[in-house]
């Protein structure tokens, strides 16, 4: 019995460490064009917000508007290089397809509905950088809420 409890404790610790590690990652750092877009915008990895900071909304209160805008420009650059945006316009279908492929979601998954809602919420924004950051922040926040609600279920 002690061994079983120890295994559960270790599993929970590993799961927590994995989630913490992901939240410390920089937004977009897992994508091919990350370094290219940082260079194009004259930024370093230190200038980019962490996933945890964005998913919790802390990026809005902890940073100046210029930092928010610059982070959004890096995100927009990556989205454009991946064919998901052109200027300030989304390719909604391609964005859904890539999201499904990346997350392994199935039709009807709440995360797809969240992506759709986030695209709808930001679609009329004219500034491509602010629009990109708001979209990514919206999706990350929705994923965090859904993950929390699934843990409680």
Curated annotation (Swiss-Prot):
<keyword id="KW-0732">Signal</keyword>
<dbReference type="InterPro" id="IPR006170">
    <property type="entry name" value="PBP/GOBP"/>
</dbReference>
<keyword id="KW-0813">Transport</keyword>
<feature type="disulfide bond">
    <location>
        <begin position="73"/>
        <end position="129"/>
    </location>
</feature>
<keyword id="KW-0085">Behavior</keyword>
<dbReference type="InterPro" id="IPR036728">
    <property type="entry name" value="PBP_GOBP_sf"/>
</dbReference>
<feature type="signal peptide">
    <location>
        <begin position="1"/>
        <end position="19"/>
    </location>
</feature>
<feature type="disulfide bond">
    <location>
        <begin position="118"/>
        <end position="138"/>
    </location>
</feature>
<keyword id="KW-0590">Pheromone-binding</keyword>
<dbReference type="InterPro" id="IPR022354">
    <property type="entry name" value="Pheromone-bd_protein_Gp-9"/>
</dbReference>
<dbReference type="GO" id="GO:0019236">
    <property type="term" value="P:response to pheromone"/>
</dbReference>
<keyword id="KW-0589">Pheromone response</keyword>
<dbReference type="GO" id="GO:0005550">
    <property type="term" value="F:pheromone binding"/>
</dbReference>
<feature type="disulfide bond">
    <location>
        <begin position="37"/>
        <end position="77"/>
    </location>
</feature>
<dbReference type="Pfam" id="PF01395">
    <property type="entry name" value="PBP_GOBP"/>
</dbReference>
<comment type="function">
    <text>Colony queen number, a major feature of social organization, is associated with worker genotype for Gp-9. Colonies are headed by either a single reproductive queen (monogyne form) or multiple queens (polygyne form). Differences in worker Gp-9 genotypes between social forms may cause differences in workers' abilities to recognize queens and regulate their numbers.</text>
</comment>
<comment type="subunit">
    <text>Homodimer.</text>
</comment>
<dbReference type="GO" id="GO:0035176">
    <property type="term" value="P:social behavior"/>
</dbReference>
<keyword id="KW-0964">Secreted</keyword>
<protein>
    <recommendedName>
        <fullName>Pheromone-binding protein Gp-9</fullName>
    </recommendedName>
</protein>
<comment type="similarity">
    <text>Belongs to the PBP/GOBP family.</text>
</comment>
<keyword id="KW-1015">Disulfide bond</keyword>
<dbReference type="GO" id="GO:0005615">
    <property type="term" value="C:extracellular space"/>
</dbReference>
């Amino acid at each position: 019995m002690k061994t079983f409890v120890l295994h559960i404790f270790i599993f929970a610790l590993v799961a927590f460490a994995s989630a913490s590690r992901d939240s410390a990652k920089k937004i977009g750092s897992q994508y091919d064009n990350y370094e290219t877009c940082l260079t194009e915008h004259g930024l370093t990895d230190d200038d980019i917000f962490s996933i945890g900071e964005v998913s919790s909304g802390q990026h809005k209160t902890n940073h100046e508007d210029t930092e928010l805008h610059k982070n959004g420009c890096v995100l927009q650059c990556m989205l454009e290089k991946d064919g998901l945006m052109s200027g300030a316009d989304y390719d909604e279908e391609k964005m859904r397809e890539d999201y499904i492929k990346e997350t392994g979601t199935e039709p009807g998954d709440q995360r797809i509905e969240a992506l759709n809602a986030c695209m709808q919420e930001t679609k009329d924004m004219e500034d491509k950088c602010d629009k990109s950051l708001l979209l990514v922040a919206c999706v990350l926040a929705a994923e965090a809420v859904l993950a929390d609600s699934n843990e409680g279920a």
